[in-house]
Every structure is written in C-alpha cells, then in structure tokens.
Amino acid sequence: LQVKLMKKLTSVLLGAALIALTPCAAPAANPIKVMILDGESGGTYHKWQLTTPVLKKELEETGLFQVDVATAPKAGEDFSNFKPDFAKYQVVVANYDTANWPDDLKASFESYMKNGGGLVAVHAADNAFGHWPEYNKMIGIGGWRDRDEKSGPFWYFKNGKLISDDTPGRAGKHGRRTPYQLVTRDASHPIMKGLPAAWMHQGDELYNSLRGPGEHMTVLATAFSDPANAGSGHDEPVLLVTSYGKGRVFHTAMGHDVNALACVGFIVTLQRGTEWAATGKVTQKTPANFPTANSVSYRNDIAEMDPLYKNGLNGLDAQPGAGRGPARPGAVPAAK
C-alpha cells in the first residue's frame, strides 16, 4: 500500500497515530554505553540483519545512548576470537538466539551481570540458551530450545495474580502475527510509570507457554493469548524485569520483525527498559503519541527500514490484519 492510502485507512479505521519522522534528541554529555549483540537466530524467521539497525536507531534517537554492535559467529563456527569486553558497556541488548556458547564466554557474561551489568532480552533472545541455567535465571522465562518442566514452571496471570504452573510440557508457542492489547501489571515500576493501564501493540507474535525459574522476577505487562489463534487462554507475560546478582534485566517478548519494532509502544518500552537496565532509573517521558487501549501508534519511518515494506501483507501470515502495514485490531479480549 502507498503511504497516503495507509494513512487514510489507519485514520478512518483505527485512529492510530502515524509519524513520518521523529527527530533525534541532542546527545547526552555522558551517554549510556550499549552493546547490541546479534549474529545468530534459530531460523530465517528472525532476521537480525534487518532488526539490529532498527534497534540501534531507536536507542540512538533518544540522545541517551552510544551504541555499538557485536556480531557473534554463527553456531558451529570458531569463537576463539570472539571475546567481547562486556565491562565496557552498561547494558547489552540481545537481539540474538543461539543454542550455546563456549564455557569461557558464558563465565565472562555471568561475571559481568553479577557485578552490575545490564541485559535487555528482545523477543528471540528468550529462545536462546535453553540449557544454560544462569542465562535462564537472567531472563526469568523462555521458550523453545528443549525447554520443558525441567526448566521451571509455566508463568501466567490468572484473576490478577501471577501463577506458576508445574504442568509438564514443552515451552514456547505462538499464533499468527496480529495486534494485541497489553495490560499493565506494575504501574509503579520506572519502566511503566506514566504508561496507560492498557494499550495496543502493532501486529506481532504473542508468545505463550513460556517457562523458567522466574527468580527475582516482576511481570510488568501481559497480553491475553487467544485460543482461537493457537493461544493458551491465559494472560501471558510480555514485559518483565529480573535481577541477577547486582545486574538488572529487562525482557520484552515483543519484536518479531521490523513491522513490530515500528510500534511506538515497543519503541518506548525498549528505550525506557534499556535505560533502566543500565542505570536503575528512567528519565524519559511518555510521548503524546503512545498507543491507547483501542488503537496502535505506528512509525512509518521505522517500518520503511524493512525492504519488504512495500509488499504489503506479510506472506508468513496470510490473513488480513496480521502482516505489514497498519494493524487492524478487532475486539480486544478483557484481561483476566
């Protein structure tokens, strides 16, 4: 669809906020040093080559962050020369999904986190390292890569309370990409303070049936996983934080592709979550164009960073409302 048509449809059908461009803020005198870690995915469906530049742009436009990218070797390749100096950075943003690391690299990252480092796990990063116990403590919950009841319980909200469920079974499911509503569960946390009680996210995968140790974990926001779309029927954690030693972790299950990363809700929570993971504080204000309970807010300048943007519907989700272009939220299930 052409941009004019997309704007017209969005305005008429959704009232979603579309922005042509967001100007960058002036750089901070002492910017937060960020490493984006990428280089591997569990499959071709997570295109880190496309999403890393988007994450970098979204962080740098705040003026708060100085961002470097560390691209790891692919699984099975030689890691002998991949020795990132984690201590140079206040926070590592993991846009990364691999099965394992050499023991010395795992020990280096564990030490970094225990001594006050920060981690932001984005979408596919909660699929990574299924057999690395310390990483699973860091991210709280995860899916796929052989995770099952040995990895920890399922976690979800029911009747307003966080439930740990020891039912046996494999971890990690999702339906087709579609818009969904997030419900804030901890409005007092710095990342969530000032955000709406409920808000719509642009078309994305909604992970369900995640499991893990859940140690020192606070769920910030959930979304209802609709059984009609291969869902669990539960309010599933989408945004959460944990602590690991002296380190802080922000985990977002959103962000499958550039389309999802173009959601203003994703952008704002990424920016705020990265600042919090690095410093324990959030200084950023809630923008006026933040999504509402019934409409998405969508950045065309971000979506256009995907070379497939002009193709319209995402072929992996051959159903209207599930692909690229403005989301089309239908009736939103009430949080339970």
Listing of model-derived features with the role each one plays in the protein:
Residues 1-5:
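Short, Lys/Arg-enriched N-terminal segments with co-localized hydrophobic residues
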Residues 11-22:
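Bacterial N-terminal signal peptides
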Residues 24-28:
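Signal peptide processing junction and immediate N-terminal pro/mature segment
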Residues 29, 33-36, 40-129:
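Helical hinge/lid and interdomain linker segments adjacent to catalytic or ligand-binding clefts
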Residues 29-32, 49, 61-62, 71, ...:
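Extracellular ligand-binding/catalytic regions of CAZymes and related secreted enzymes
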Residues 60, 66, 88, 156-245, ...:
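Catalytic beta-strand/loop cores that center a nucleophilic Ser/Cys/Thr
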Residues 99-190:
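A glycine-rich, often tryptophan-bearing local segment used as a flexible ligand/cofactor-contacting loop or short
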Residues 118-120, 220, 250:
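Structural detector of well-ordered beta-strand residues that form the stable sheet scaffold
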